[in-house]
Amino acid sequence: MQLFAASALASEGATAFSVEDAPAKAAAVASPTPAPADGIDIPFTRFTLPNGLTAVVHEDHKAPVVAVSIWYHVGSGDEPAGKTGFAHLFEHLMFSGSENRKGTYFEPFEQVGATDMNGTTWFDRTNYFETVPTTALDMALWMESDRMGHLLGAIGQKELDTQRGVVQNEKRQGENRPYGRTDENILANAFPANHPYQHDTIGSMADLDAASLADVKQWFNDYYGAANTTIVLAGDITPEVARAKLQKYFGDIPAGPPVPRQQPWVAARETSTRGEQKDHVAQTRIIREWNVAQLGHADEPLLELAANALGGGKTSRLYQRLVYKDKLVDSVSVEVQPFALASQFVLTADVKQGIDPVKVEKAIAEEWANFLKHGPTDEELERSRMSSRAGFIRGLEKVGGFSGKATVLAESQVYRGDPAAYKLDLARIQQATPETVKAAANRWLAKGDYTLTVVPVAEGEAIDDAAPKGLPVADGKPAAVMPAKADYSASKSTLDRSSGVPKVSDFPDLSFPKIQRGVLKNGIEIALSERHTIPVVQMQLQFDAGYASDQGRKLGTSSFAMALLDEGTLTLDSVEIARRSELLGARISAGSGLDSSSVSLNALSSELEASLALYADIVRNPAFREADIERIRGQWLADIAQEKTQPTGIALRTLPPLLYGDQHAYGIPFTGSGTEASIKSLDVKDLRRFHREFIRPDNLKILIAGDTTLAEITRQLDKVFGDWQATETPVPVKAIANVDAPTKARVFLIDRPDSPQSLILTGSLAPSTTVANNIEIQTMNGIFGGTFTSRLNMNLREDKRWAYGASSFLQDAIGQRPFMTYASVQTDKTAESAAEVLKEARAVIGDKPITDEEIARIKAQRIRALPGSFETTGSVLGILSGNALYSRPDDYVQTLKARLQGQTKADIEAAARAVIKPDALTWVIVGDLEKIEAPVRALKLGDVKVMDADGKVLR
C-alpha cells in the first residue's frame, strides 16, 4: 500500500488521463557477491553504524540528485491478531510530523523540489523514499531521522484519528473498484490463519477502529529502531560523505530491541479448493493461485520464466490457446508475486461474454498439464530471458522511486542480507534450461491451487461484503529466529535539533540534453536528445490525429486503428511481431491521446537496427485482417463494459459531452474507447481510411532520446522511413471549435448501488495548453488542488478525513481544455464533501484569495524540482513530445525557471478567475443514489438530473 496515489496532474510535455549479521562497526564492504550477469551491475558500498543501522551507498553522478530510501524490516505480516492494517496505518502516521518539526511532513520537501516522494507498506517491510537535490540531502536526512528517533511526542489522538480516517477511505476506494475485493479473498484462502500473509495489508475496518495510541507507541518502540533499518543513498554522493552525514543525523538513535525474524513458510496446499465472489463487474474473472517458493529460493526465478511462457503475453501458451485459438477469453495473464516468506503464482483470465467458465478451466487444465509434461521450448526460454534482461536494464536508469536502483539494493539487503543478491536471480535466469524450469514447475504447480471465480451480481442484488472465512490454523509454521547478538550502541548527539530543519539556500541548475534537429531524405523532421546513461533508445512517431480526429467518424476510430497496428503487417501476424519484439528486447506500442496519435519504440542500442525495421513495418504496412479486427473488437467491447462499472471510467465517459456538446471534437468519452455502437460498426474500410489519411509521412514528427547520435539515427531512420511517400490527398483538418461556457451549475447523478464511496467530479472549460499564461494557470492549480498540500487535499483528506485524496487537474489540449476536480469520498459524506469543494472554489477567487506564501511555495517546488525531473530517457522524450505537440521552442525547459520566477500575484489571481467558475460547474457524482440523492439535491448546487453510465438522462 502506498501513502498516496500519484497525482493526476499533467506534467510539462505530457498529457494526463497511474540480513547480514552485524559486521564490524568500522567495516565497509564494496560490492561482494557474484560476477555481474551479462555486465549488469549496481556498484555499492555497505557499512553499519555503531547503533546497528545498515547503510548502502551507490554513486551515480549523472544528475545532481540523491535518492533516499529507508526500509524498516516490518510489515503487515508482523501484525498480531486483532491489529490488522496497523503497519500501514503507522506508515501514514509517520507523515504527521515529528517532535522537532510539527505539521505535515511534505512541506519542506516540496520547498526543495523533491520528487518520487512516498511511503509504502507490504507484508515484510515498510519503506519511505524521496529523491532530493544534492544540496538538500541534509534537510532530507534531518527530517527522516527526526521522525525515526523523535516521533511519539508529535502523535496524539487527533493525528491518529485523522490518519485512521484517511486509511479507511483508502480501503473504501480500493473496494469500490471492480474486482477490488479479490485480494482479501485470495489471501484468506491461500494461507492458513496463522500465516503472516493471510490478511491483506489494508486490514479490517474493525481493527483499524480499535487502534490506540498505546498501539502506536508499542509498534514504534518494537520495530523502528536503528538495527531494524536499512538506508540506501543512491545518486550524486560518495560513501565518505554518506557515512559522515548518516552518523551525524542517525547515530544517536537507539538500536531498538532485537526483532524476531519470521522464517519462510510457503504453506503449499495438497488439494485444490474453490470459491466464488459476486461483484459489480462486467464479466466473469477466473483467478487461480498457487503458493510457491519465496524470494531468494533457487526456484523463484525459474517460476518467473514459467509464468512468462504460460501467460506472459501474446506468444504465451495460454494466450495462444484461450484468446487466439478457442476464443474463450478476452485476456489472460500469469505472474509471480515474490515475497520474503512465500510467493504467489497467479493466473487471471477474463471470460468472454456468453462463454461457460467451465470450458475455460478445461482448456487451462490441458495447457497446464502439457507444460508440466514437456516444459518450455528453447525459444520460449530465450524470449523470456531477453525480456527479463531488457526490463532490468531499463530500471537501472532511475536512482530512486518505486523501482529504481535504490529499491533493488534495499530489497536485496533487507530480504536477503546482501545488496547484490539480485545478481543471483539474474544468473539463475541466464543458466536456466527447459529441464530446470519444467522441474521447478512440477515441484510447485502440479497441485494445491485455489480458484476464485468472480461473477457479475444480478441487477438489484446486493453484494456480500463480509470478510471471507478463510483457512484454519495449520501445523508446520517455523519458529521465528532471533538475530545474532550484537553490541550496538548509540552515540551522543552533537546535533541541535531545536534550531529546526536545515536551511537549503543553494540549488543545482537544470542540465537538459541539447535538442538536435535533422530531416530525412523525404522531408520528415526529427528531433534528438542524446542520453548515454544506459544502452537504450526511445522513440516516438507523433501524428496529428488523436481522439479529436474521430469527429465526423465513428467514435473510437483513432484509438482502435492504432491498437491494430501491431496486430499484423502484410508479412507478419501479431504473434510473430510479439515473438520478434521479445527476442530483440524491444517494446513497441501505439495509441492515441486527445490531439495526437503515436507509435513508440523502446529498444536496446545493440538491437536498434533490427528493432527499427520491425517498428517501421508495423507503422507503414498494417494488415487490418478481419480475424484481428474481430479479436480486438471483442476485447474492446469488454473494456468499455468494464469502464462503465468503474466510478472513474463512468465519470470520464460522461463528463466531456456535457462540457463540450456531443458534436464537438472533444465531446467524447475521454477514455478514447468510443461507444459500443460505434465499435461494433467499425470495419476494415474505416481503419484503412484513418491510416491513409493520418498515418503518413507529411503528418509526422519523429522524436528520439537515448543512446545514439544524430548522424547514426538519421542513417538508420532513412533506411526504414526515408522512402515513405505521402498520398496527394491532403491531411484532414480537425475542427476544434470554441465553446461558450455554461452560465449556471448543473448536477448529474449516476447510480452505482452498494458503493462505499461516491466519486465527485466537476468540470469547467479552461484556455488551451498553448496559451501564454499556461504557467500561471498551472501555478494556480497547484495551490488549489494540484499538490499534496493543496487546499482541496488538505481539506478533504487531512482535515475532514472523508477522502483518501482530493485533487484538481487540467487535461492538456490544443483547444479549450477541461479543468476538473476529483474526490472519491465516503458515501455518508457525499453532500458535505461536494459543499466543501464548492466552498474552496468560491474562496480561492473570493474571501480567501491566493496568498504570497502559497505562490512562493509552488514556484519553489517547481523550479527546484527541475534538475531532478529529467533523470530518465523517457522524461526527456516527454519534453520533446510536448514541445512538438504544443509548438514550444527547443529551449522551453531551459527557460522555465525564469518564467516561473517571473510570475506575478496579479497574473496568477487572474488565471484563477479565468479558470475557476464555482457557480457554473458541471458536476458528475457517481454513487449509491438511494443514500446520496436526497442530500445532494438538498444542497441546491444546480439543476439535478439522473443519468445512466452512457450519459442518457433518466429523470
Question: What is each PLM-predicted segment?
Answer:
Residues 1-8:
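Bacterial N-terminal signal peptides
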